[in-house]
Amino acid sequence: MEKLLIVNADDFGLCKGQNYGIIEAFRHGIVSSTTAMMNCAEIYHAAELSKQNPALPVGMHFVLTYGRPLTAMQSLVDAKGELGKWLWARAEAGELNLDEIAQELTAQFNKFVAVFGRPPTHVDSHHHVHMLPQIYPLIESFAHEKSLPLRIDRHEAQQQGMVLNSPRSTEWFDAGFYGENLTEQSFLQLLAKADQNGINTIEVMCHPAFIDKILMTSGYCYPRLTELEILTSPALKQSIEQLGYRLGSYSDC
C-alpha cells in the first residue's frame, strides 16, 4: 500500500528568509506543503512567491502567540497590542475569551482568501495553540464548517483526554524534526516509527529558512538553516521513495 507523507513547512509569511527557504525546500527538496501566518508583514511577499509556485499547497497557520492580531483581542494582547506566549498561562487560569478567538480565526481565514485568492488547503497553528483543550472544539467546528482538513496531534489529544469528532486529517502528526541535533537519519527515524505503528498517512512539521534579521531575533534560528540543508538532500528524497512514501498534501487526505 502506498503511504502518504506530508512535509509541511510552517511560518510562511513570517519573514523573507523564511519564505525563500520554504520555496527552496519545495522546489529542490521534499517540502510538499506549507502554512501561512496571516498577521505577519511578509505575508504579501509569501503570496507573490506562491503565485510563482502554484503547485505548492498552502494552508493557514492560525496565530495567537506572535505579532499583532487582525481584530481587537483585549484578553490576549499586552500593553503594546501584541500577542505572546502568555496564552498558556491565561488558558490555565481560565481567562481565554473564546468569542475573541473565534473572531480572529474568521478574520485570518478571510484575509487568507483575499491574499491568496483561494481557501487554504488545511488549518494548523503557530505553537500548536489549536490543540489546547479550550480552543480545539472551536477550531474543529470551524474546519468542519469550511470543509477543511486539520492538523491533529493525536498523541497530545490522547494525553489531554480530548474528544475528536472525526476531523479530516492524517493518521499521525510528528513534530520531532525540530531542535539542535537534526540529521537525515533523525528524519528517517520518524518514518520508521510510523511504519512500526502501521501508519500510512503522516505529516512531519518543519521550518526551513535562510537566516535574516527577523530570524536572528527568534529563539529558533540557525536550526532552520540546518533543516533547509537536510530537506534539500537528494539522498533523503531517495530514501523516502525507497520506503514507499509519496510526497503530498492535505488535499490527498
Swiss-Prot record:
Broad class of enzyme this protein falls into: hydrolase
Biological classification of the source: Bacteria, Pseudomonadati, Pseudomonadota, Gammaproteobacteria, Enterobacterales
Chain segments annotated as coiled-coil in the UniProt record: none
Official protein name in the record: Chitooligosaccharide deacetylase
EC number per UniProt: 3.5.1.105
Residues annotated to bind Mg(2+): H61, H126
UniProt KW Zinc-finger keyword: no
CDD domains given in the database record: YdjC_EF3048_like
NCBIfam families: PRK02134.1
Signal peptide positions on this chain: none
Keyword Metal-binding: yes
Keywords of the record: Carbohydrate metabolism, Chitin degradation, Cytoplasm, Hydrolase, Magnesium, Metal-binding, Polysaccharide degradation
Biological role: Involved in the degradation of chitin. ChbG is essential for growth on the acetylated chitooligosaccharides chitobiose and chitotriose but is dispensable for growth on cellobiose and chitosan dimer, the deacetylated form of chitobiose. Deacetylation of chitobiose-6-P and chitotriose-6-P is necessary for both the activation of the chb promoter by the regulatory protein ChbR and the hydrolysis of phosphorylated beta-glucosides by the phospho-beta-glucosidase ChbF.
Pathway the protein contributes to: Glycan degradation; chitin degradation
Main location: cytoplasm
InterPro entries: COD_ChbG_bac (IPR022948), Glyco_hydro/deAcase_b/a-brl (IPR011330), YdjC-like (IPR006879)
Family named by the database record: Belongs to the YdjC deacetylase family. ChbG subfamily.
Cofactor: Mg(2+)
Subunit structure: Homodimer.
Localization in the cell: Cytoplasm
